[in-house]
Amino acid sequence: MKFSLKSLLTIAAAASTLILAGCGEKAVDNNKVKIGVMAGAEAQVAEVAAKVAKEKYNLDVELVTFTDYVTPNAALDDGSIDANAFQHKPYLDKQIADRGYKLAIVGNTFVYPIAGYSKQIKSVDELQDGARIAVPNDPTNLGRSLLLLQQQGLLKLREDVGLLATVRDIVENPKKLEILELDAAQLPRSLDDVALSIINTTYASSINLTPEKDGIFVENKESPYVNILVAREANVNAENVQNFKKAYQTDEVAKAASEIFQGGAVKGW
């Protein structure tokens, strides 16, 4: 079988295109998108966004649920999902610094304020000396919790500590409180064993607690911890990802989040 020079050049060009395509992002179907979310109430909010995306952009959204804070970014990094919606910027920045992920912010979702919850006390004034307080153990939410405890006058952190405070940064602890660092998912169960637990709204909602109704004290809603939609740097501007963002940032989704979280979700866009 003979090939003309023109045919050979055409074949070579096609082969080169296939090789180059294999080195970057996979071919994108802009009518489909796979989004990672936390199981529970956040997934319910995302389901509303998925419905809006289908109605407004003919976008088929597959939601992939997670129960921890580590796996969603790993799944995004390896291409298992197209984007995720579960974290705030300080957490993302820490993950990028620690793991080298090439991830980027697509847009804001909601502020889910953390709060102090208890089965033993009704105000911080009732905390006994040596009381045990449970806080999240991931670096950003640990710092977030310690700053909240400082705002309540329960301890003092060293000056200019920033957002990533640790227990080593505590310089005053007049009640000699014992700070227990636990996985965030374990915090709701810790309420039976500690005087006070600082819990993210996502996990608090799993046991029907809301900041406004049940929190002894609540984080300021003007915090830097607005949650974000995140994609890879390579697909952050992809049509399917951008259309999901536009579907998420709608009044329909904001209304649903307010109802699902009983006022514990504040629109971040």
Swiss-Prot record:
It is a lipid-anchor. Residues 1-22 form the signal peptide. GO terms for cellular component: plasma membrane. Its main location: membrane. Disulfide bonds: none annotated. A lipid is attached at C23 (S-diacylglycerol cysteine). A lipid is attached at C23 (N-palmitoyl cysteine). InterPro entries: Lipoprotein_NlpA. Keywords: Amino-acid transport, Cell membrane, Lipoprotein, Membrane, Palmitate, Signal, Transport. This protein is a component of a D-methionine permease, a binding protein-dependent, ATP-driven transport system. Belongs to the NlpA lipoprotein family. This is Probable D-methionine-binding lipoprotein MetQ. It comes from Vibrio cholerae serotype O1 (strain ATCC 39315 / El Tor Inaba N16961). The gene is metQ.
